[in-house]
Amino acid sequence: MASKISLHTIQLLIVFLLSVSCSKQEKNEDGVVKVNKNGIPVMMPLQEELPKLSTAFINDKKYGVSRFFEKTWSEKNDNVAFLVAKNGQIIYENYMGFANKRTGEMITKEMPLHIASVSKVLTSTAVLMLVDTKKISLNQKVNTIIENFPYPDVTIQTLLNHRSGMRNYAYFTFENGNWDKKETLTNEDIVKVMVEKEISLERPTDTGFGYCNTNYAMLALIIEKVTGLKYPEAMKEMIFAPLGMTDTFVFDIAKDRDIIAPSYKGNNVEIGIDYLDGIYGDKNIYSTPRDLLKFDKARYAPFFLNPELIKKMYQGYSYEAKGIRNYGLGIRMTEFEKGEPFYYHNGWWHGNTSCFINLRKEKVTIIVLSNKFTKKTYQAKKLAALFGDYPFKLDDGGEE
């Protein structure tokens, strides 16, 4: 009798475990893990609308934002694409200046501009989606994915949070004849140079923060190795296409150089393409504020990433030096003694500058893009004071 009860109990336990397993699989299919027919994880739009803003709220904030814009940017001198939204709803946007002075094209809401290092926010998102779907892990050694990668202690996480200790490819390829500047450098070439020229680390891995574009060039290679797609195609399939980001693409130096919006020095002199413009992951995404808003809004979807991964994304990792600035997994942050953490990412490449601000608590998105060099772009952080407990003042002078 005892053995029969024991057997019956075991059978019930097996049925229970199977049912739990099935329910988890169903939840994954509908929730955290969104995988397309090709086995590629895809970012899904937010299905449920966020609370609708009142007309009074929109008018109040629009007044403050528009005054800031008009005081900061001039139609005679600036090229800028600017957008402020809350709950995915646009409060104010403005577009002015030349996208291309040679052709006379102007900046419009549909005109893609180079978003520089804001590209890192999208690259890191694609990597975290691969982590969420268990295709890779944060602690996985990079040399298990990229063949001949020369630094055995570097992990995916230390690439994401800039603690790998690697040197910037822009410097070591320029030095000592390490690369022929007449030839376009590729992501694969970076690995080749690091190996053949025995490029040393700047510091031991995971001993301190060192912002380095090489980290995100390697992450782009990881995306390629894991998905079997080239980075531009992977980003389109994983993020751009499912979110309807129709004006967003990764620059292809072989076919896009004559159709992109060029960048300019502050004196309006056009800046040409150089040997570093074939590298992607750290930069080279072209987009619009409206497309980037689609991306940011989708990050509020309940199953964007699992909660634990989101927590890791928005935490600081580098506290060796005192200060309030830190870096998460693809996002910069300022951790004030009082008030909310301030999450953002700035960018600068050639004459392109960019600023992407995500006020998480308030669900506010602030985006500024410019293809004519200016530090005014980074002043957008002051707008946070209109929406929450952030120690910025709209009337502060100076540039950062």
Regions found by a protein language model. Give the residues of each.
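Active-site-proximal loop and beta-strand segments within enzyme catalytic domains
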Residues: 43-50, 89, 98-211
